[in-house]
From Swiss-Prot:
This is Chaperone protein ClpB. Residues 84-145 are annotated as: Repeat 2. The keyword Transferase does not apply. Its main location: cytoplasm. It comes from Prochlorococcus marinus subsp. pastoris (strain CCMP1986 / NIES-2087 / MED4). GO terms for biological process: cellular response to heat. Residues 8-72 are annotated as: Repeat 1. The keyword Aminoacyl-tRNA synthetase does not apply. Residues 558-769 are annotated as: NBD2. CDD domains: AAA, RecA-like_ClpB_Hsp104-like. Part of a stress-induced multi-chaperone system, it is involved in the recovery of the cell from heat-induced damage, in cooperation with DnaK, DnaJ and GrpE. Acts before DnaK, in the processing of protein aggregates. Protein binding stimulates the ATPase activity; ATP hydrolysis unfolds the denatured protein aggregates, which probably helps expose new hydrophobic binding sites on the surface of ClpB-bound aggregates, contributing to the solubilization and refolding of denatured protein aggregates by DnaK. Residues 770-860 are annotated as: C-terminal. The lineage of its organism: Bacteria, Bacillati, Cyanobacteriota, Cyanophyceae, Synechococcales. PROSITE patterns: CLP_R, CLPAB_1, CLPAB_2.
């Protein structure tokens, strides 16, 4: 007989190749029947199923075969070329005889198993010749079809290999409980019970719970909580990616799909398919003119021979399924909306026990409420309940990691002990009095530390054991509850009653006592090394990590920082007290959670002449509040003077160049939502750009070119403008009242900006012209920065009051603000110091002294 791929099915040829590898790894010269049987057991699902039905212990066979192969004679090296053993040839001849009798085209795995039953050694392990009639009868029953071509894989094997039995998972307690969603599950059951077109498709955003609804249906089928038309049905989830993967030859993928469909059809409605991401069936496997999966599904879907549940997102349904009306009409749409915050809290309460058992922690109710509410407010690019569940999962995982790791206090003592022991070894070599005295002190300190170390380690182990005991009890309770459900389903009521009213109650009492003892130890005021409960702060910490937004409760240092915020800003920004008060008040409202959650933290329009501190105040706010200079997004609005500049802000629309890049403003906020947005010189932007900002200022959101909703609800928006600066200058010179200045500037604003734009701003702040004494304070700030730069170069810096007055008088100009002062400091001081450094004038005396000499700045 020929041993070539064309004579075998794919799975049978894979078995032959694997048996060859087993023989090579065992340093054999021949491929024997034992190698074939071991390969079958390891790889073939149908063989495993047949052997299990024949009451054969597969693990024992595998162990016996391994020992038989180890006992065989071995070559010195692995053999590249192997011979077909006599026993193997007999096996394949018998397999071929069965193929002929079944009218199959190629040899498949079940034929090989039949051939092995005639082998002297293998027949003792699996099937002896007396059981061959039973085997043939079993094979006829299990085979739903004959092998029809060289790409045959039985439908049983295909379903087992590429499908997951959700009803079995529900029976085994693997699936999470499904809370709520009764209306959606009822609608799904209603469509499945139709005579034709009984195929629901669940459509919703990612993470709203489409797959969970199908899992809920599987649990209802197992519990018998469904109409008679769905009782005792199998719900099998098919993975389209796995079906396509590995289909090397043309037609192989279609064959796999056909095998699945024929198995479903032959089950006479007992099997319901679930295809997650059902949009993947459109075009799947369509290469070189072959049919795609959707065209293979359509006939059976229309006739009602196949009951299929699909799940996909709104966008994917629109892009793929709606393009094929023939496929779309065969499915009935069920819209799945994201649950409300209250519904999400109920879902989390239902899942709490599963996560507590998995992570060996306790999850408080306020943590569940925080996960739902904080995720809804701060995580805007994902959907409930998925994002809330992820928060709980990560917070519990983080706490579990802390529990299983060494506590920080013990770790610090361990490091200190190691450091002192090294110092001790070093000092033992010394003989002077100082070293001996130091050695004595170290030994005393080491003695105290080791006692403390031992006490803490004992306490840590004790607390850890208590937590582990509670965790083990929860696992036992979960396992007992599963056994009770299984006993009730199999009508073993005696066992169910014994478990429910005996074992379960006993375990619950033990858990209650242990939990109360642990809670009492926390309440007693004892200092505990470990914490077992996930609380609000844990959830807030995870949200902060994800979004960079501080949402945790304010600690004392942060409260002090916010209370002193106004003073801090006044130290860095001179002469603009009204602006500073307005900004600090807005930030205090936001950080204490009193601001409107549906608007930006604050939106300001800074007006005033050039050089009075509009942009500088924005930079100082970003540095002070967000603790980073990178938390400011600055857009120079003179770059947005054309009408088409709108696309630069929010991103180009589909079909235009740069669509994938996104907008300059929207992308910056999407990546860093907790930041300050500075739109400099807003009056220079095109009117259409201002119209785009209306929604941002009012609702705190904007839709970018790619259709994503970008949230500005955690941003401070600052717009600066020079409008009315000439009026402010003229009126300031005449010492006009501030209210008069404000009224005149407002008139100019209304001429330029639309009323709906001005009405959406929180505050319009007018920056006043700088007075001479204020400019002197600014000069001191600038010189302090210079001093800090010189200190890094080991140079001391001093300047006389006369020199400062000289700088201020020579740079004072109402029209230009503080910028001329910066220029004169650069020209008169920094340039001269730079020349002195280059001339090595500071090698001996590391001091820079600035004074006035002959009416000019003199750098000594």
């Amino acid at each position: 007989m020929k041993f070539v791929p064309s004579e075998f099915s794919n799975s049978a040829w894979d078995i032959f190749i694997l048996s060859k590898e087993i023989a090579q790894n065992n340093f054999q010269q021949n491929i024997d029947s034992e190698n074939i049987l071991l390969a079958l057991i390891k790889q073939d699902l149908l063989t495993s199923k047949i052997l299990k039905k024949n009451c054969v212990n597969i693990r024992k066979i595998e162990t016996k075969l391994t020992s038989l192969l180890d006992a065989k004679a071995k070559m010195k090296n692995k053999q590249k070329t192997l011979f077909i053993g006599e026993t193997t040839e007999k096996v394949f001849l018998k397999a071929n005889d069965l193929r002929v009798s079944f009218n199959d085209v190629v040899i498949s795995t079940e034929h090989i198993l039949y051939g092995l039953s005639y082998d002297e050694i293998c027949s003792e392990l699996v099937l002896n010749t007396k059981k061959i009639p039973e085997f043939l009868e079993l094979l006829n029953k299990m085979k739903s079809e004959s092998t029809i071509n060289d790409n045959f894989e039985s439908s049983n094997e295909t379903l087992d290999k590429f499908g997951i039995d959700l009803t079995k998972s529900a029976r085994d307690g693997i699936l999470d409980p499904v809370i709520g969603r009764d209306e959606e599950i009822r609608r799904t059951i209603q469509i499945l019970s139709r005579r034709t077109k009984n195929n629901p498709v669940l459509i919703g955003e990612p993470g709203v719970g489409k797959t969970a609804i199908v899992e809920g249906l599987a649990q209802r089928i197992v519990n018998g909580d469904v109409p008679s038309s769905l009782n005792n049905r199998q719900l099998i989830s098919i993975d389209m990616g796995s079906l396509i993967a590995g289909a090397k030859y043309r037609g192989e993928f279609e064959e796999r799909i056909k095998n699945v469909l024929k198995k479903v059809k032959s089950s006479e409605g007992k099997i319901i398919l679930f295809i997650d991401e059902i949009h993947t069936v459109v075009g799947a496997g369509a290469t070189g003119g072959s049919l795609d999966a959707s065209n293979l599904l359509k006939p059976m879907l229309a006739r009602g021979e196949l009951r299929c549940i699909g799940a996909t997102t709104i966008n994917e349904h629109k892009q793929n399924i709606e393009k094929d009306p023939a496929l779309e009409r065969r499915f009935q749409k069920i819209k799945i909306n994201a649950p409300s915050v209250d519904d999400t809290i109920s879902i989390l309460r239902g899942l709490r026990e599963k996560y507590e058992v998995h992570h060996s922690v306790r999850i408080s109710d306020n943590a569940l409420v925080a996960a739902a509410s904080l995720s809804e407010r701060y995580i805007n690019d994902r959907f409930l309940p998925d994002k809330a569940i992820d928060l709980i999962d990560e917070a519990a995982s983080r706490l579990n990691m802390i529990i299983t790791s060494k506590p920080e206090e013990i770790d610090e003592i361990d490091r200190k002990v190691l450091q002192l022991e090294m110092e001790n070894l070093s000092l033992q070599r010394e003989s002077d009095n100082f070293s001996l005295e130091r050695l004595k002190r170290i030994n005393n300190e080491l003695h105290d530390l080791k006692i403390r170390q031992s006490e803490l380690n004992h306490q840590w182990q004790k607390e850890k054991e208590e937590i582990d005991e509670i965790s083990n009890l929860k696992e036992e309770i979960e396992s007992t509850q599963l056994k009770i459900e299984q006993a009730k389903r199999s009508f073993d009521l005696n066992k169910a009653a014994e478990l429910e009213f005996g074992t379960l109650i006993s375990l619950q009492k033990k858990l209650k006592i242990k939990s109360e003892n642990l809670v009492d130890s926390f309440k007693s005021g004892e200092k505990n090394l470990l914490r077992q409960e996930v609380n609000f702060d844990d959830i807030a910490e995870v949200v902060s990590k994800w979004t960079s937004i501080p949402v945790n409760n304010l600690n004392q240092s942060e409260k002090e920082k916010l209370l002193k915020l106004e003073l801090t800003l006044k130290e860095k920004i001179i002469g603009q007290n009204n602006a500073i008060c307005a900004v600090s008040d807005s930030i205090k409202r936001s950080r204490t959670g009193l601001n409107d959650p549906n608007r930006p933290i604050a939106s300001f329009l800074f007006l005033g002449p050039t050089g009075v501190g509009k942009t500088e105040l924005s930079k100082v706010i970003a540095k002070t509040i967000f603790d980073s200079n990178s938390s400011i997004t600055r857009l120079d609005m003179s770059e947005y003077m054309e009408k088409h500049s709108v696309s630069k802000i929010i991103g180009a629309p589909p079909g235009y160049l740069g669509f994938e890049s996104g907008g300059q403003l929207t992308e910056a906020v999407r990546k860093n939502p907790y930041s300050l947005i500075l739109l400099d010189e807003i009056e220079k932007a095109h009117k259409d750009v201002l119209d785009v900002l209306l929604q941002v200022l009012d609702d705190g959101i904007i839709t970018d070119g790619q259709g994503r909703t970008i949230s500005f609800k955690n941003s401070i928006i600052v717009l600066t403008s020079n409008l009315g600066s000439q009026s402010i200058n003229d009126l300031s010179i005449r010492n006009e009242d501030k209210n008069e200045i404000k009224n005149i500037v407002n008139v100019e604003l209304k001429k330029f900006f639309k009323p709906e734009f001005l009405n959406r701003l929180d505050e319009i702040i007018i920056f006043q012209n700088l007075e001479l004494n204020e400019l002197k304070d600014i000069a001191k700030l600038q010189l302090k920065k210079l001093e800090n730069r010189l200190i890094k170069k080991d140079l001391n810096f001093q300047i006389t009051d006369e020199a400062i007055d000289h700088l201020v008088k020579n740079s004072f100009d109402n029209s230009y603000g503080a910028r001329p002062l910066k220029r004169i400091i650069q020209k008169e001081i920094e340039t001269k110091i730079a020349n002195n450094i280059l001339n090595n004038n500071y090698l001996n005396k590391k001091e820079v002294y600035i004074s006035i000499k002959d009416g000019c700045i003199f750098v000594n």
